Amino acid sequence: MVHWSCEEKQFITSLWAKVNVEEVGGEALARLLIVYPWTQRFFSSFGNLSSPNAILHNAKVLAHGKKVLTSFGEAVKNLDNIKKTFAQLSELHCEKLHVDPENFKLLGNILIIVLATHFPKEFTPASQAAWTKLVNAVAHALALGYH
């Protein structure tokens, strides 16, 4: 179980309240696919992923990014029980989708970058530390289904 200070919780929840899930989620997933092109193999059904421009404007990428970030929002709502919150998603990604758990860390790092660019004033070093702790906790929870 991850232990959160009141300050960490405040950094996370106050910034999350400002996040446009559709915009930030789409951008984060698109960046993941551009920066780490080997992750595209999990999204072969999404159509044209042939260039950064194609990825950034791919409706399926943007929609799935929103879905991913909506799920991430469950971590924000359940900071004290992230493992349980992501148990089913962990099983899905492990047993059915066979996603390398390292990709969860990569996406978390990308999310940090996207949040920092969207909220430069709010994304102080202390806020970054709290968000880094959160994305690492989510990545760990999603990787628990791997044996």
Curated annotation (Swiss-Prot):
One of the protein's GO biological processes: hydrogen peroxide catabolic process
InterPro entries, alphabetized: Globin (IPR000971), Globin-like_sf (IPR009050), Globin/Proto (IPR012292), Hemoglobin_b (IPR002337), Hemoglobin_oxygen_transport (IPR050056)
Record's keyword terms, sorted: Heme, Iron, Metal-binding, Oxygen transport, Transport
Reported tissue expression: Red blood cells.
Function: Involved in oxygen transport from the lung to the various peripheral tissues.
PANTHER family for the chain: HEMOGLOBIN FAMILY MEMBER (PTHR11442), HEMOGLOBIN SUBUNIT EPSILON (PTHR11442:SF7)
Binding site for heme b: H64, H93
Pfam families with a match to the protein in the record: Globin (PF00042)
Protein name, per record: Hemoglobin subunit beta
Keyword Metal-binding in record: yes
Taxonomic lineage of the native organism: Eukaryota, Metazoa, Chordata, Craniata, Vertebrata
